[in-house]
Amino acid sequence: MNGFLTVHFLLLIRDIWKMFRKVLIANRGEIAVRIIRACRELGIPTVAIYSQADANSLHVRLATEAYCIGPAKSADSYLSIPAIMSAAMVSGADAIHPGYGFMSERADFAEICEKQGIKFIGPTAEAMRKMGDKATARKTMIENDVPVTPGTGIVKTVEEVQEFAHRVGY
């Protein structure tokens, strides 16, 4: 039965991934290579982006197609929303996988993808905004009955911190 469940799970994952005709990977290096290999196993064409310095990188060679998005400096390439979105539009990608770092925690990027009709493979912009701020994240967790460690929320005075420290210990 375990083998059956594994096959069923893999078929389900394949069907979910088939929702995408082409995935742009908004990253470089090992994470981009891993995403490209996973997409290849699922039969999904991939688009790599790269800076001028990364033109000969493995992820560029492995992808179905690749686009240079700017100079070596990350701020002018891998962190450039206009450059990444241009590559997505030109390539016809219908989804963008951010990998980690760079665009993976940029709520504004996820929102732009959504507005352009491109699926952001990751959390929604709203979820990123809520979880990006510790106070809001904690409040959201408490409101949804998720256990959290003892904490104070936002404190305004030294006295509040001292009172909490005496009450909870440290």
Show which residues each predicted segment covers.
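N-terminal beta-alpha lobe that positions the nucleotide/phosphoryl donor
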Residues: 15-170
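N-terminal amphipathic/hydrophobic targeting modules at extreme N-termini
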Residues: 1-11
